[in-house]
Amino acid sequence: MTGESSSETRSVTVSRVIEAPPERVYDAFLDPEMFASWYPPTGYTAEVHHLEPEVGGTYRMTFYGDADELADFEQSFGGTYRELSRGERIVYTDAFESDEPTMAGEMTVTITFVEVPDGTEVTVHQEGIPEAIPPSDANAGWTDSLGTLAEIVEDVDA
């Protein structure tokens, strides 16, 4: 697993090799039930309200805190799919639903899937991270989420 973050550009890049074929890993980003099962970082659960996996399609979801100290946490967000190439690349926008000025703005997330001898190298590049979120926290969140994704898709009979 590799990762880097930049406070200057408000961006992060995280990579991980997942022992599964690119198409299986790609599909886990676009299946609502599967996406909700791995995307929220530890301490959170997610509900996907809608997900239209087509160019120009939109998605909306909410993260909920599931631990005592996070019990009151609820954050909704969504965006639009800009590019979808099965097993190769996903590009989408992402924006939080918040009145807080430090949470404003649209992020762009680019995910690439490259077949490697051990499976698939997944690289996530997220840019335009809101002021309220330190890029190091976004990096940690993606690292955690990709770890959960690996557990789920690697545990499927090929």
Language-model segments: which ranges?
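Short beta-edge strand/loop motif at the mouth of beta-sheet-based domains
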Residues: 13, 33-72, 157
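Hydrophobic/aromatic beta-strand elements that line small-molecule binding cavities or substrate pockets
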Residues: 16, 49-51, 77-83, 107-114
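Hydrophobic pocket/interface hotspot
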Residues: 25, 35, 59, 81, ...
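Generic C-terminal helix-cap and adjacent flexible tail
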Residues: 8, 151-158
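A generic structural micro-feature
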Residues: 6-8, 53, 71-75, 101-105, ...
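Hydrophobic ligand-binding cavity/cleft-lining segments
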Residues: 1-46
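Beta-strand/loop substructures that line and gate deep hydrophobic ligand-binding cavities in soluble
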Residues: 91-143
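Short, conserved beta-turn/loop elements at beta-strand boundaries and strand-helix junctions
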Residues: 85-90
